[in-house]
């Protein structure tokens, strides 16, 4: 067991990608990197952690991650020679629309019918009012950036009075720029006031896994979830 975060820090959400690349390198080179700065365990259960690099023959490794909003994940990395052969059985899945939610110009419509509208002067105020209209009380909602609030609120209406088993539902989210508007705001603060001014209140609840994670927690969804960044929305391509 080891941690790589101490080598390069948080990196605003890119650490999981960097760590995965390093894990692949470790597998290929049969070396387990030490946990930088490790001195003693901080947990009661015994775990094998070392500060020094070790040469260990490896076939597989498990990369785990814990993201903001309670979104946790794990992937298994395997050397090509030890990979299981994929099943050739393919199942046909019919995709059809059961409900739609549209949010535009301070108006929220469901299946083409307006269910909430507001005279709010800006989107930030409108989306808060739209969420309050659902009767929701998740205080984490107010920490999210506006794009996360948009996705979270839309699902509140979309899944209202829907019954399903946790494993029956997955999530596929798409937008054109991830959390770019908040990322720009975060960078402007650093440019104007320096690195010390960077604040979690600006960037913590912005990443795509936040909106996906909070939706899963709220609705007890245990299926797979994915966030795709595409310039143009193509429903047919996503279904494929």
Task: Please state what every model-predicted region is.
Residues 1-240:
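Conserved "HGTGT" condensation-loop signature of ketosynthase/thiolase-family condensing enzymes
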């Amino acid at each position: 067991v080891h941690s790589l975060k101490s080598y390069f820090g948080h990196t605003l959400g890119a650490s999981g990608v960097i760590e995965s690349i390093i894990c692949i390198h470790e597998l290929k080179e049969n070396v387990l990197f030490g946990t930088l700065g490790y001195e003693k365990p901080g947990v009661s259960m015994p775990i094998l952690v070392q500060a020094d690099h070790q040469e260990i023959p490896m076939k597989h490794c498990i990369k785990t991650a814990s993201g903001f909003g309670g979104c946790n994940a794990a992937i298994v990395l395997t050397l090509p020679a030890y990979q299981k052969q994929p099943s050739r059985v393919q199942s046909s899945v019919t995709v059809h629309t059961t409900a739609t939610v549209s949010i535009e110009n301070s108006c929220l419509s469901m299946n083409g019918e307006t269910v909430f509208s507001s005279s709010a002067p800006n989107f930030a105020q409108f989306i808060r009012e739209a969420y309050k209209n659902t009767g929701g009380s998740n205080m984490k909602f107010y920490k999210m950036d506006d794009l996360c609030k948009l996705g979270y609120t839309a699902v509140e209406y979309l899944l209202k009075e829907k019954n399903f088993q946790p494993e029956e539902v997955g999530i596929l989210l798409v937008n054109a720029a991830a959390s770019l508007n908040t990322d720009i705001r975060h960078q402007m603060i650093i440019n104007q006031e320096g690195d010390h001014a960077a604040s979690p209140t600006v960037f913590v609840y912005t990443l795509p896994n936040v909106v996906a994670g909070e939706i899963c927690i709220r609705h007890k969804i245990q299926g797979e979830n994915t966030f795709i960044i595409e310039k143009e929305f193509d429903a047919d391509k996503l279904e494929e």
